Regions:
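Short glycine/threonine-rich catalytic loop with a Thr-x-Gly-x-Asp
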Residues: 149
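Cysteine-based protein phosphatase catalytic domain of the PTP/DSP
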Residues: 1-143, 160-179
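Glycine-rich nucleophile elbow surrounding the catalytic serine of serine-hydrolase chemistry
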Residues: 152-159
Length: 179
């Protein structure tokens, strides 16, 4: 089958050795950097700049980069620990790179990034873009997939919008006739 995959993350993210890493502020290491209302183009430009910077750091450090990871503690809290990763350029990918790689391996994925601010209703332009993506999935008999960071807010918004579109498509005429 085919997949219409929509990434709803607003935060810049890089995949390093297959694991996602996000930009964080030094004084708020457990909180994503928020850029409310940022466009997809800006997020992807930031990701490409971070990718260039991290690749340059790896060249300067003989293939090593310093990252930070979250480690769960027994009390339910998290600690931030430094981790040295050994990398090559091909190990440092943007989300778009990841999906292009998946497509190049023969998977039929129609990927798009639609940046949505977490825990806020999508603005009309974003709603329209999501409507187009869902309609494309319906028209091409594809699966519709949404992702964000945690799968609680933005992914849920995408799924609710998809459900509304499918419901109106399937039952809209019947609903109109009942009134």
């Amino acid at each position: 089958g085919r997949i219409v995959w929509t990434n709803l993350r607003e935060e810049p993210v890089l995949y390093v050795n297959g694991r996602p890493h996000v930009l964080r502020l030094a004084d708020q290491p457990l909180t994503n950097v928020e850029a409310t209302g940022v466009t997809t183009e800006v997020v992807e430009r930031i990701e490409r700049a971070l990718q260039r910077d991290l690749r340059e750091e790896a060249r300067q450090r003989n293939g090593h980069v310093l990252l930070h990871d979250e480690v769960a503690l027994e009390n339910g809290e998290y600690a931030i620990v430094p981790v040295w990763e050994t990398v090559q350029d091909s190990d440092i990918l943007t989300p778009r790179d990841v999906y292009e790689r998946v497509s190049s391996e023969g998977f039929r994925v129609d990927y798009a990034r639609v940046a949505i601010t977490d825990e806020q209703a999508p603005v009309p332009e974003v709603f329209s873009h999501l409507e187009e993506r869902v309609q494309r999935a319906i028209d091409t008999d594809s699966m519709c997939v949404f992702n964000c960071q945690m799968g609680r807010g933005r992914t849920t918004s995408g799924m609710v919008i998809a459900s509304m579109i499918v419901s109106v498509r399937e039952y809209g005429q019947l609903w109109l006739e009942q009134d």
